[in-house]
């Protein structure tokens, strides 16, 4: 009976000591995986930040191009009604009172000089 108790006690001590070693190893593995995950997340975050900065630069470039060309788009073409006090006709056009077809509308139109 004593040998059985001693055997069980020995097996119990071995299981407990090996089990604790496994817990420590598991804990260390989990810490390594967490650190790797953090480094991966940092890398992904930096990559996403670079892509967003590139996209923002492209959008700002397009906006600046639009503002550069916006003056030409706001000008009025030939045969379009204009305001006599604030003519916005193209540079080669003049805001004049129409001679025939626009008399009925009582409006000014952009004509060639």
Curated annotation (Swiss-Prot):
One of its GO terms (molecular function) is toxin activity. Its main location: secreted. Disulfide bonds join 82-95, 89-110. GO terms for cellular component: extracellular region. Keywords: Disulfide bond, Ion channel impairing toxin, Knottin, Secreted, Signal, Toxin. InterPro entries: Toxin_22. Pfam families: Toxin_22 (PF08092). Residues 61-83 are annotated as: Disordered. The keyword ATP-binding does not apply. Residues 1-21 form the signal peptide. Residues 22-74 form a propeptide. Expressed by the venom gland. It comes from the Eukaryota. It is found in: Secreted. Belongs to the neurotoxin 14 (magi-1) family. 01 (HNTX-16) subfamily. The presence of a 'disulfide through disulfide knot' structurally defines this protein as a knottin. Probable ion channel inhibitor. This is U11-theraphotoxin-Hhn1h. It comes from Cyriopagopus hainanus.
